[in-house]
Amino acid sequence: RMNMFLHNINYDKFDIKLGNTLTEPHFRDEKPFDAIVSNPPYSVKWIGSDDPTLINDERFAPAGVLAPKSKADFAFVLHALNYLSAKGRAAIVCFPGIFYRGGAEQKIRQYLVDNNYVETVISLAPNLFFGTTIAVNILVLSKHKTDTNVQFIDASELFKKETNNNILTDAHIEQIMQVFASKEDVAHLAKSVAFETVVANDYNLSVSSYVEAKDTREIIDIAELNAELKTTVSKIDQLRKDIDAIVAEIEGYEV
């Protein structure tokens, strides 16, 4: 509440509840929501399969499996999805490991992809969020997609270095939003991937698996390098001849 007041948001514009989102969910009477933004804790422990009733919870049952007890990330994702309206969209900040790990997390990714809920995965630069230097991802879920593609955006190079952390400037955000809205492929930045490709890749949703990183290595001109080597070798040969001549001259004086 204090944070809301500090940002000049009047009390009648928000409703904050205290509790465990996963085991004591609030706002069930108010759902569904058209827009959800969430930054849940990364890879925290939760009761998971130790509570046999959770697998029948309407939020988790459709996936057929619960998020691992040691990593609740996908439990928060499924919670948000359940609260989303048929025309809604959710943006969830996630730990990057959930996009490629196997086991239950892979099965949940399969559920999300097979049901066409995954609109976009955005990888961000490290050290953007307070309290962590992790390069996190944003998972965008939608229940009103017009195709079955999954968009991947590599925004890991979009940041401005500040004293203690990195920041996204307005220009960076605008660039990401333009690519997100257009769904166009941009070299080294964004790619829309067919459903079949994601399936063939074992439902891996890691951005680096689909967006080729820019090669920052120096381009070497082999012909130019070879010419320089020949010139250097020629200079060395001439230097050896000069040294031999000097040595011979010195030895002649000694005689």
Regions found by a protein language model. Give the residues of each.
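A conserved structural/catalytic subdomain of Rossmann-like adenosyl-cofactor enzymes
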Residues: 21-24, 28-255
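S-adenosyl-L-methionine
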Residues: 1-29
